[in-house]
UniProtKB/Swiss-Prot annotation:
Family note: Belongs to the glutaredoxin family.
Described purpose of this protein according to its UniProt entry: Glutaredoxin necessary for virion morphogenesis and virus replication. Functions as a thiol-disulfide transfer protein between membrane-associated OPG128 and substrates OPG095 or OPG053. The complete pathway for formation of disulfide bonds in intracellular virion membrane proteins sequentially involves oxidation of OPG072, OPG128 and OPG088. Exhibit thioltransferase and dehydroascorbate reductase activities in vitro.
Record flagged with keyword Isomerase: no
Annotated protein name in UniProt: Glutaredoxin-2
InterPro entries: Glutaredoxin-like (IPR008554), Thioredoxin-like_sf (IPR036249)
Organism in which the protein naturally occurs: Cowpox virus (strain Brighton Red)
Gene Ontology CC, one term: host cell cytoplasm
Highest rank taxon of the organism: Viruses
Record keywords, A-Z: Disulfide bond, Electron transport, Host cytoplasm, Redox-active center, Transport
SUPFAM superfamilies linked: Thioredoxin-like
Record-linked Pfam families: Glrx-like
Location of this chain's protein in the cell: Host cytoplasm
Subunit and partners: Homodimer.
Length: 124
């Protein structure tokens, strides 16, 4: 069973689309799940199944810790049911306007370094 990369992006975001396209190159190593963050957090979105308290905590955590990320990536281990935050910002080159804006070697390194169960995320 492969680990899963969960990509939280925004609709109509060209950077999010380019990141998603680049990360697809890792599909031989990971299952990849793309999540539209706006739809996810809508009142009737998938996050509503968490209940009001957990949903509110999740929204608060996103706002407090991930608001400076255009796109967020987590890795998920389906066997242990643990998640880890992946610091994608280290792999992005914003001077590029296509999927090459993601340095896949750096991203792979960040995925491997991401520690399960650490929250809030440790960023440099």
């Amino acid at each position: 069973m492969k680990n899963v990369l969960i990509i939280f992006g925004k609709p109509y975001c060209s950077i999010c689309e380019n990141v998603s396209e680049a990360v697809e190159e890792l599909k031989s190593e990971y299952d990849i799940l793309h999540v539209d963050i706006l739809s996810f957090f809508l009142k009737d979105g998938a996050s509503s199944m968490l209940g009001d308290v957990k949903r509110g905590t999740l929204i608060g955590n996103f706002a407090a810790h991930l608001s400076n990320y255009i796109v967020s990536i987590f890795k998920y281990n389906p066997q242990t049911k643990q998640m880890a935050f992946v610091d994608i910002n280290k792999s992005l080159d914003f001077t590029k306007t296509d999927k090459s804006l993601v340095n896949l070697e750096i991203l792979k390194s960040e995925i491997e370094k991401a520690t399960y169960g650490v929250w809030p995320p440790v960023t440099e």
